[in-house]
C-alpha cells in the first residue's frame, strides 16, 4: 500500500490520475452535443438561476465578451435562455431551458454510470479506501479563507 506523506510526491502521484479521470469523464459526453465546459456552465447557471452574464464571467474567471460567446452557443443549442428581469427591464438573467436540464441529467447519468462500473471492479477494501479519500479530496477544493 502506498504511504506517501510528502506533499510533493503525493501531488505528483495524484495529478496524472485526476487528469486521466477527467479525460474519461469528458468522453462520456460524446453524442450529447455538449462539451465538458458547456456542461459546467449549465451547472453554474442552474444553481444560480437568473445570474447575469457579467457575474457568470466573474465566477468563471473569463472576460464578459468571451462568456457572451459561450452563452450565444448554448442559447443557439437551446440549452440556455436569456430572461429579462420583471423588476428591472434593463437586466437580463440566464436560465437553463428544459433541453438544458435534460442534457445535464444525461451527462450526470453517463458519468455516474461510468464511475460506478469502474467501482464495481474494486474489492470492498479498495472501495472503502476510495470512500475514505472523498472527504480529504474535497478539502483540497475548499476555498482558502481571505
Residue ranges of model-derived segments:
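Charged, amphipathic alpha-helical coiled-coil/dimerization segments
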Residues: 50, 72-135
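Amphipathic alpha-helical interaction segments
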Residues: 13-16, 36, 40, 129-132, ...
Amino acid at each position: 500500500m502506498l504511504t506517501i506523506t510528502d506533499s510533493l510526491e503525493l501531488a505528483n502521484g495524484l495529478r496524472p490520475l485526476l487528469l486521466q479521470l477527467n479525460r474519461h469523464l469528458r468522453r462520456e459526453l460524446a453524442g450529447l452535443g455538449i462539451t465538458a465546459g458547456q456542461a459546467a456552465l449549465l451547472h453554474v447557471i442552474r444553481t444560480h438561476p437568473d445570474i447575469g452574464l457579467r457575474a457568470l464571467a466573474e465566477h468563471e474567471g473569463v472576460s464578459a465578451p468571451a462568456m457572451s460567446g459561450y452563452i450565444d452557443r448554448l442559447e443557439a443549442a437551446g440549452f440556455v435562455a436569456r430572461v429579462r428581469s420583471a423588476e428591472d427591464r434593463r437586466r437580463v438573467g440566464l436560465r437553463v431551458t428544459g433541453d438544458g436540464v435534460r442534457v445535464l441529467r444525461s451527462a450526470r447519468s453517463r458519468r455516474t454510470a461510468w464511475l460506478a462500473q469502474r467501482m464495481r471492479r474494486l474489492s470492498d477494501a479498495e472501495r472503502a479506501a476510495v470512500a475514505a479519500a472523498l472527504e480529504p479530496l474535497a478539502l483540497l477544493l475548499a476555498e482558502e479563507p481571505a
